Structure formats: structure tokens, C-alpha cells
Amino acid sequence: MRRLALALALPLALLAAPLARAQGGPLEITVAGAELEPMPIAVPEIAPADPTLGALAADIRRVVVADLERSGLFRLVDPAAYIERGIAFDSVPSYADWRAIGADALLTARLMPAAEGRLQLQFRLFDALGQSQLLGRQLVGDGEDWRRIAHKAADAVYTQLTGEGPYFDSSIVFVDETGPKGERVKRLAIMDQDGANLRYLPSAEGLVLTPRISPDNARVLYISYDSGQPEIVLQDIRTGQRERLGNFPGMSFAPRFSPDGEEVVLSLSLEGNTDLYAMRLDDRRLRRLTRSPAIDTAASYSPDGRSLVFESDRGGSQQLYVMPAAGGPARRISFGRGRYGAPVWSPRGDLIAFTKILGG
């Protein structure tokens, strides 16, 4: 039987009086064959410092629990089984009581009013097996952003217990198509990663394709056909302000943000060639990356921003290639029958997802 040990950092800034902690070993998730056993975690009700915050505290807990359970790595311990109830946020939990009901981890929190009508969520994460506090944080935000506060809290727990990067506080941007056949309307839309908070963004009047969101969830890139040919548009999500990215004589398409959000890789069709270019967003400086009579497009950055994977027919058929993000020789990585395209690097950088077309 393999065991996957999850690294647990030492406690961060404690929110209350100093606590006595014991050094414990890492929490473990047991992997039997191909099946992952979710980590049991207890999440008592969030204590509202003001009775008027009771409903909102329950909503925040619901989102946190849903995020953790949806990841497939955590299992919520049934609150009906709790031995210790009404645990004070500033107190040390009775670790034995939580271990007795099978909880490996315990998350406690309280919701408080903050200055200027804002909210403050304080939370602490405990290792019930190692009898220690693993994490203590506070988040402050506007009342209407309570879902984002919940997602950020879930992100902190997820990263602390798995060592993986957070993703709950992220958004999905897409093209929404509605209306009867023959009168379909396409609109640029955005929603939280859990499908909530759907809203439509003001966009170009014509066809909109392939939207990409920036790493900080503040801007979006997409292809607009307002001028009759594909052009890349950069839009601020909050203000709706739009601008065309560059003024090129040919077609521009397939944009994607760099991991730091400071650069965009794109394809430009100039003088009969379609090559990859990188553009700095601060000064709009353009840098050519490939020089090939083939079609080079659909580039995606590696998580560290040092490499690019893209599709090209330079070898006679549509295949995948990897090259340095600063430019340089490209190495083919796909072989065999079919056409390979639309590559995207995984967040950890160990895998590349792509499409493969066989036959027609």
C-alpha cells in the first residue's frame, strides 16, 4: 500500500493567545491501488461575532465545505458525530474528541464586522493527529464579496494540507450561446469556478471567440471579428474597458497570458506566414519567437513561464512542439497517427493536455 504524505508547514501568525502545540508527523492520505481515500476533516459552524451575521456565516461555511469536498481529497465528518460542541475560537480544541470521531483535521472560524462595513473572517486549521495548529489567518473583504472570502479560506486549507497550488478563488470565462436556432446570440460570460456568480461582460457586438482570463482574474483576452477579420481584444473585467491588442496588418489570434500576467503569446499572420510572437503588456513591445513557413499557433506557457508548447504543421502534419519562451529551437513531442492541437500545460507542469484527431 502506497502512502502519500502531505507536507504540513509550521503554524503561521496565530490569531489568539499563544497555544501549546506538540510536534506531530505529517498527515497522510492513503492511496490503495488507483483509489484515493479522502482526508476526513471537521468543519464546525462558523461563529458570528454579531447575531446579524449568522446567516452569512452559514453561507460562507457551506461554500468552504463544498470547495473542499468537490476537490475529491476531503471528506466532511458528519456534524452529528461531534463530541466537542460550541468550541471557542480562541481555545485549544480537545484533540482526543476529534480523533475519536475520525477527524484528521479540524477547521474553526469566526466572522466579525470590520471597518467601513466590511467583513473579517478568522480561521484556524488544526492537525488532530499531531495535536498542533497548522494555520491561522484572517481575511477582510466587502460584504458582497463573501463568496470570494469563502473561496480564499478554502484555498488556504487546500494548499496547507495538499501542498498543491490554490484554485477555488478562480473564475471561468466563456462564450455563452442562447436563443432559438437561426437567431443564436453569443455573449462573453464569467462565473466562479464552482458555477456560481454568473454574469455577462460587455463585449464587442460581433463574433467573440476563445476568451482567456488573466492569472489575477482582472482581465480577459478574446478574439473579435468586429473588423471582419480576427483581432485580439484586451478587456478589464471590472470596468468593461476594451482595447485592441496591437494594430497589425494581418490576422492576430490564439492569445494566452503568461503565468505572471505581464506578457501575452499570440499568433500573427504576416506576409503569408503565421508565427508566434510575445507582447509585453506594459509597453506593447512585440518580440518574434518563431520563423517558419509553417503555421505556428495555439501556444501555452509552462507554469514557470520558461517554456512554450504549441501546435505546428512544420513537419508536414499538425503536431506539438516545445520551445523556450524567450525563443530558440523547437522540439517535437507528439508522434504517431492523427493531428495534435490545442495544447495546455497542467498547473504542476508535469503534463500537457491536447486534442487528437484521427481520420476526418
Which positions does each model-derived feature cover?
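Short loop/turn segments that connect beta-strands within beta-propeller blades
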Residues: 129, 192-196, 236-240, 280-284, ...
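A flexible loop/linker signature enriched in serine peptidases of the S9 family
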Residues: 165, 177-187, 203-206, 223-232, ...
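Residue-level detector of Asp-centered blade-edge/turn motifs that repeat once per structural unit
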Residues: 166-168, 215-216, 259-260, 303-304, ...
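Bacterial N-terminal signal peptides
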Residues: 7-16
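Amphipathic beta-strand/beta-sheet edge segments enriched in Tyr/Trp
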Residues: 89-156
